From Swiss-Prot:
<keyword id="KW-0436">Ligase</keyword>
<keyword id="KW-0460">Magnesium</keyword>
<dbReference type="GO" id="GO:0005525">
    <property type="term" value="F:GTP binding"/>
</dbReference>
<dbReference type="GO" id="GO:0000287">
    <property type="term" value="F:magnesium ion binding"/>
</dbReference>
<dbReference type="Pfam" id="PF00709">
    <property type="entry name" value="Adenylsucc_synt"/>
</dbReference>
<feature type="binding site">
    <location>
        <begin position="39"/>
        <end position="41"/>
    </location>
    <ligand>
        <name>GTP</name>
    </ligand>
</feature>
<dbReference type="InterPro" id="IPR042110">
    <property type="entry name" value="Adenylosuccinate_synth_dom2"/>
</dbReference>
<feature type="active site" description="Proton acceptor">
    <location>
        <position position="12"/>
    </location>
</feature>
<dbReference type="InterPro" id="IPR018220">
    <property type="entry name" value="Adenylosuccin_syn_GTP-bd"/>
</dbReference>
<dbReference type="GO" id="GO:0005737">
    <property type="term" value="C:cytoplasm"/>
</dbReference>
<feature type="binding site" description="in other chain">
    <location>
        <position position="226"/>
    </location>
    <ligand>
        <name>IMP</name>
    </ligand>
</feature>
<dbReference type="InterPro" id="IPR001114">
    <property type="entry name" value="Adenylosuccinate_synthetase"/>
</dbReference>
<feature type="binding site">
    <location>
        <position position="39"/>
    </location>
    <ligand>
        <name>Mg(2+)</name>
    </ligand>
</feature>
<feature type="binding site">
    <location>
        <position position="12"/>
    </location>
    <ligand>
        <name>Mg(2+)</name>
    </ligand>
</feature>
<feature type="binding site" description="in other chain">
    <location>
        <position position="305"/>
    </location>
    <ligand>
        <name>IMP</name>
    </ligand>
</feature>
<feature type="binding site" description="in other chain">
    <location>
        <begin position="12"/>
        <end position="15"/>
    </location>
    <ligand>
        <name>IMP</name>
    </ligand>
</feature>
<dbReference type="GO" id="GO:0004019">
    <property type="term" value="F:adenylosuccinate synthase activity"/>
</dbReference>
Amino acid sequence: MCDVVLGSQWGDEGKGKLVDLLCDDIDVCARCAGGNNAGHTIVVDKTKYDFHMLPSGLVNPNCKNLVGSGVVIHVPSFFQELENLEAKGLDCRDRLFVSSRAHLVFDFHQRTDKLKEAELSTNKKAIGTTGKGIGPTYSTKASRSGIRVHHLVNPDPAAWEDFKTRYMRLVESRQKRYGQFDYDYEEELARYEKYRETLRPFVVDSVVFMHDAIAANKKILVEGANALMLDIDFGTYPYVTSSSTGIGGVLTGLGIPPRTIKNVYGVVKAYTTRVGEGPFPTEQLNEVGETLQDVGAEYGVTTGRKRRCGWLDLVVLKYSNAINGYTSLNITKLDVLDKFKEIEVGVAYKLNGKELPSFPEDLIDLAKVEVVYKKFPGWEQDITGISKYEDLPENAKNYLKFIEEYLGVPIQWVGTGPARESMLEKKI
């Protein structure tokens, strides 16, 4: 059976920390979507490990790790991330596997990603992309012109000729669209000819890999990337990523049936953040937002960009839960709220004076909503490292209880600090 960890807001909720905790007792950790456009840091024995594309289960020496078919892979970044982990003492090459069906991100995808964003910014419609080429790669995938891992690693000499033909078609189509931008495609092709050999040992048929693990009754953890509000279908479109980041992406990104999923853990930051553009109803462009940003160290692992900050939005979480069906929640970074005398939570949206029955799909409406807040007294004490739920201040427990009751989902874990061990588990 599979347990799944998913982001419930706009990303950066702290999924990696929960995955790290759960990985102590699993056999397989799998990534199902996204690429190296997201990131998180895991601290083990005072050593920091930065993850972007690779599964966090690599920190567990007994865990096998799969980069699934729904992930898009920039091969140079794949090896760079692997080398960075190895430089910090992780021996993980024989525990890392890549789906033969995953699509490849090329440097020209990254170039055109930035060119497209520059075009949009002139009309003040920029998405806020990371520039990692993720969107253009999913675009070529959807148009059936993309290149998959098996196209690269097939040892048949004819396969390499086919790869080069596919590659040049993509380059030429981008040059027609954006002009003769500065790009040495021959140099990239030469690099990928070498990657044919170096990537091949990692490549597996991920459908067989996953179904063999399921048949053997292995404990499997699926690590979601990004979050529901960045989902290509259900997020704040077009200010989203280009993949399915919810429970649907788990099924399509790994090729597993719904009945194999046992638990869906929703990771929720105790307040709200987002990176990039797009409406953000509970955003606080004031001292509150600045405090959350500073105390929470809200800077992106991948881009270094400051994250926009605001109060917890339960309208977003109710919508997120309706789609993903969380069995329990992990509330992270509760300690960031320690110094607030008063804490607010968004509980409803009003548009033109009328309360909306659900989260609006139209961003024109979303940008105009008035948030209805419920105020809570803060606990105004340091909760860092508290390991028992019973030891939390009453006001903190009241805050958490309200979240549970509003969503109808139990809270199973609470993050009380940045350290790996600063995560208490609550009986549910």
